[in-house]
Every structure is written in C-alpha cells, then in structure tokens.
C-alpha cells in the first residue's frame, strides 16, 4: 500500500486535518525553512495528534546531540536527514537512538551516485528508507519521471517497471507532488510512499502559506484509490 507523508506541519488546524484524513506519516521541520517549528511548538502540536500517525522529524546537517535533544522532548518515529550526512554519521546516529526509531535519508534526484549507493543492501543496517526529491526541496518544483528510471536503468515506458522497491531499499518520492499529478507519478515509478508539502498548500491573504484541507483530502483520496485498484 502506498504510504502518505504530509510534511511541514505548523499549526493546530493542520493537525485537525491530519486527524480526519489519517495519512500514515506527518513531518515537523527542525531546520531552516519557512515551515520550521521549534521542538516546543512541535511537542504542543503533537499532543493533539492521532497516535496512529507516525511523527517524522526533518533535520539538515544538525549534530547528533542536536537531534537527540529534540527526541528527548518529542519522541520521533522517524528521523529524516536532508543534509550532507554521510554513512559514518548515520551509523553513529543509529547506534544512539532507540531501535524503534527509523532513519530516512533524503537525496536529490541529481545525486545519482548516492541514490544507487543507499539503495544497495550494504546500507540497510543504517538506512530504512531513502527519499528522492528535486534539487530544491520544499519548493514545489517537479522533476521528469524519466530521471528516476534512467537512474535505475529501466524502461520508463512500462508501467510499474521503474521500481526501486524491488531492490533492497524502499523509497519515498517527493518533489512537486500535487493532487493533480500524484496518480501519474505513483504509477510511473511505484514508490513505497509519497512526501508532500507545498503541493497541498494555499496562499493566504497575508502572504503566508498553509495546508489546504481540500487539497490534502483530494491527494489522499487519489492515493487510496490506487491502493484499492
């Protein structure tokens, strides 16, 4: 079943939307971003979150101690790393967190070498999932689906053929996913899950951006329909 992660949660209304629609994962951003929250803010928001929804903490080039400081206040189900964290860093982090905490590594679609490396079985002890994103995470920019298929050396014209999950490491797909394009992107590359943020947002009168319940619902319904079929 295709999993859904809604990332960049910042307010109580968005928590309410999550509780109604029940994606498998939600994300708090703890690195510099327009969606960044403090650990105290995230803790307060999470108190009202449905316990079935897993919490992902997004970090970028933080120290291990900084990540552990967050976990000590807000128990995370998943640590998502978006920076230049290498294998040694990830292995050290893995050794210092509870076994129940998964580690995901986000990689740019242009970082072909590392995507292939982390998809290899040798890294399964430290990486539980990889997340393939565009070159500007959180920007809403898409990238050609063929880029993933070229990376994996398979035929992009065959439905469900471009499938990293048949390798040794499952992956989440990010990068400009919206309710309008989610079905096509899932069918073409068969990810384990999708990661969405800007694609389900609206711009408010004051210029801020927040999650739209209708867009969130539309996207999740389309993913669920694919799962049923």
Swiss-Prot record:
It comes from the Bacteria. It is an enzyme of class 5 (isomerase). It catalyses: N-(5-phospho-beta-D-ribosyl)anthranilate = 1-(2-carboxyphenylamino)-1-deoxy-D-ribulose 5-phosphate. Gene3D superfamilies: Aldolase class I (3.20.20.70). Pfam families: PRAI. Its EC number is 5.3.1.24. GO terms for biological process: L-tryptophan biosynthetic process. One of its GO terms (molecular function) is phosphoribosylanthranilate isomerase activity. The keyword Secreted does not apply. Pathway: Amino-acid biosynthesis; L-tryptophan biosynthesis; L-tryptophan from chorismate: step 3/5. Keywords: Amino-acid biosynthesis, Aromatic amino acid biosynthesis, Isomerase, Tryptophan biosynthesis. InterPro entries: Aldolase_TIM, PRAI_dom, RibuloseP-bd_barrel, TrpF_fam. HAMAP family: PRAI. Belongs to the TrpF family. This is N-(5'-phosphoribosyl)anthranilate isomerase.
């Amino acid at each position: 079943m295709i999993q859904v992660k809604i990332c960049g949660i910042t307010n109580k209304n968005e928590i309410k939307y999550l509780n109604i629609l029940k994606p498998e994962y939600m994300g708090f951003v703890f690195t510099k971003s327009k969606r960044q929250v403090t650990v105290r803010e995230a803790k307060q928001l999470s108190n009202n979150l449905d316990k079935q929804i897993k919490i992902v903490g997004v970090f970028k080039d933080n120290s291990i101690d900084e990540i552990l400081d967050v976990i000590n206040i807000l128990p995370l189900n998943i640590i998502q790393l978006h920076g230049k964290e290498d294998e040694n860093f990830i292995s050290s982090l893995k050794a210092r967190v509870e076994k129940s905490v998964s580690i995901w590594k986000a990689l740019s679609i242009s970082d072909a070498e590392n995507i292939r490396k982390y998809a290899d079985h040798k890294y399964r002890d430290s990486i539980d999932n990889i997340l393939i994103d565009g070159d500007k995470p959180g920007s809403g920019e898409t990238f050609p689906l063929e880029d993933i298929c070229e990376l994996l050396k398979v035929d992009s014209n065959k439905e469900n053929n471009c499938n990293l999950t048949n390798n040794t490491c499952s992956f989440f797909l990010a990068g400009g996913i919206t309710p309008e394009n989610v079905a096509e992107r899932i069918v073409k590359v068969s990810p384990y899950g999708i990661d969405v943020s800007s694609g389900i947002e609206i711009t408010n009168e004051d210029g801020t951006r927040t999650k739209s319940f209708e867009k969130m619902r539309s996207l999740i319904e389309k993913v669920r329909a694919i799962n049923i079929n």
